[in-house]
Design a protein with these regions (language model features):
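Active-site hotspot residues in diverse enzymes, especially metal/ion-binding acidic/histidine motifs
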Residues: 1-377
């Protein structure tokens, strides 16, 4: 077939314009987690600089068009919504892991968004997926050109299929495609909610409720909803972004676990460290009970009750009963979680060459309907 030089020249242009020329041997950008906000800012500087001057809805659909990407939303990408989106780097058929053709005659520069994303998840989730694919196009073309030039098999030179579930494998076992997915997954929400503008708007809104430290959990939920509407992202994306930016009280707003919201809660400032929480899915609690001997002893002692997806001291000050007679958190407990609840650390695995520095990598336990479901310890 011969190799088209168009992708090669596009890659040359990208490398010349990029001020981060740190690439792995496979031409994957070397980006550490603490550089993600900078990556998002560079993307917006190039494609939508006005989004760095005022809090606004980032027109990611227009950006995709300006990047000469064609967006198609009428092709299901998997049987069970395993993939939200796919971006095509070279013409041809796209195969799944069983070598079954999922997209025929795909064209370079095409983004496929599964049509079920909007109505089974949210429009905000669709926008995050599109930002994810745009970042792939912006930063990950060199790898795909290399794969084509060396004659790599399967999809490696053609497409990235973007799964909703983060990779649960240890990061030191990740392949290049998995590192590119990690980069795009974490940069995408930062593109839609750039750090400086999100802080500006969040502080402005929280000031009407007494400020960052004094605002109630209800106030934080109102602010999250206003940010979600302004930036046109999902509620959970807005919450997670606030937490990323250091608004720790947002942890207690709109807790979503095991497919449902539980009641919001508050706690003393400083009670939770980074990547800590009072909320844990039932499956993760059960896993800890089965595999951690000391934790099993703690549960078996009867000192704690698992209710509302929190592990709470078994004391009438903190435990109330609902009309059905089931244990639930008391109103006092909901405003003093640091007094009565076990703190869980979100699970991490370590390192890799694609980050450039030793850094921890966040994982999700399974396919989740929200952007921040993780494994706990």
């Amino acid at each position: 077939d011969g190799i088209s030089l168009l992708p090669y020249f596009a890659v040359q242009k990208e490398l010349e314009e990029s001020d981060n020329d740190r690439l792995s041997g496979e031409l994957v950008p070397i980006i550490s987690r603490d550089q993600f906000d900078d990556e998002a800012e560079k993307f917006l500087t190039r494609y939508c600089p006005e989004a760095l001057d005022k809090p606004m809805r980032v027109p990611i659909e227009t950006i995709a068009s300006d990047m000469k990407l064609q967006v198609i939303e009428d092709v299901p990408l998997s049987d069970n919504l395993t993939y939200f989106g796919t971006i095509i780097f070279d013409n041809g058929n796209v195969l799944d892991k069983h070598r079954k053709i999922t997209i025929r005659n795909a064209k370079r520069g095409t983004v496929y968004l599964d049509p079920r994303v909007s109505y089974e998840r949210s429009v905000g989730t669709k926008r995050t997926t599109l930002a994810h694919e745009c970042f792939h196009w912006h930063r990950h073309q060199p790898y795909h050109v290399l794969m084509k030039m060396i004659g790599a098999d399967d999809n490696l030179g053609k497409a990235i299929q973007c799964q909703i579930a983060a990779n649960s494998m240890d990061s030191d076992k990740w392949k290049a495609v998995e590192w590119m997915e990690w980069q795009a997954k974490d940069v995408a929400p930062r593109i839609l909610m750039p750090a400086k503008m999100t802080r500006m708007k969040a502080n402005q809104l929280l000031a009407t409720y007494g400020g960052v430290d004094d605002a109630s959990i209800t106030a934080y939920e109102n602010v999250i909803d206003e940010l979600a509407e302004l930036f046109d992202v999902s509620r959970q994306a807005a919450k997670v972004r606030l937490m990323d930016l250091g608004y720790s009280k947002a942890e207690g707003a709109y807790p979503f676990v095991d497919g449902q919201y539980v009641r919001g809660y508050s706690f003393e400032a400083g009670a939770l460290g980074k990547n800590q929480t009072f909320t844990i899915p039932y499956a993760d609690l059960f896993k800890a009970y089965c595999f951690d001997r000391e934790f099993k002893k703690l549960i078996d002692s009867g000192q704690f009750v698992f209710t509302d997806r929190h592990l709470v001291l078994n004391n009438e000050k903190y435990i109330a009963r609902n009309q059905a007679g089931n244990a639930t958190l008391s109103e006092y407990a909901l405003t003093h979680m640091d007094e009565c609840c076990v703190v869980f650390s979100k699970g991490y695995s370590y390192q890799s060459k694609y980050q450039g520095v030793k850094y921890y990598t966040q994982f999700m336990r399974n396919a989740a309907p929200v952007e921040n479901q993780v494994e706990y310890s």
